[in-house]
Amino acid sequence: LGSKGTKKFEIPTRIPNVTFEIPPSWGGYQPVSLRHDKARQLYFWMFPATGKVGHDDLVVWFNGGPGCSSLTGVLTEEGPVKFNNVTHKAEPNPYSWTNLTNMIWVDQPAGTGFSRGQPKNQSMEQIAEEFNGFLLSLYQTFPKLQGKRLWLAGESLSLIHI
């Protein structure tokens, strides 16, 4: 999914206090618009498919909200790293959705989790417009994502704007 131009988004495969290497991934900020409002940026963390299938698909995951960080999903539910509630340690997640598809977790709308900028949205339509701008920006930064089948998934209130 990465290319020469996406190197600055690469996440190290070694993370402090995690005793194993995580799969290659990319994370960072993308603006909600290609033309203006660069101050409002959504945070994302993206992992490529690791299995034999799913390389032509891209699933974007949203945790509840609006206003719930999707990092909860990547670190406690569908991601390749899962934090154990008993041992309080990170461990590989054998049931990660990355076994089946390319995955992106997004903190949205702006102002949620690690995303930047003041929340301005007054409606679900405005949240969708902001996400669309983010997605166009992401496709521009990661051209290998263009042409992949896009799937939107989530839980709780996120299902209203999916």
Predicted features, each with a name:
Residues L1-L58:
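Catalytic-loop region of hydrolases
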Residues Q41-E129, L136, Q140:
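N-terminal cap/lid subdomain of alpha/beta-hydrolase-fold enzymes
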Residues W105, S156-S158:
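Hydrophobic alpha-helical cores of multi-pass transmembrane domains in eukaryotic membrane proteins
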Residues I160-I162:
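Conserved small/polar residues in nucleotide/adenosyl-binding loops
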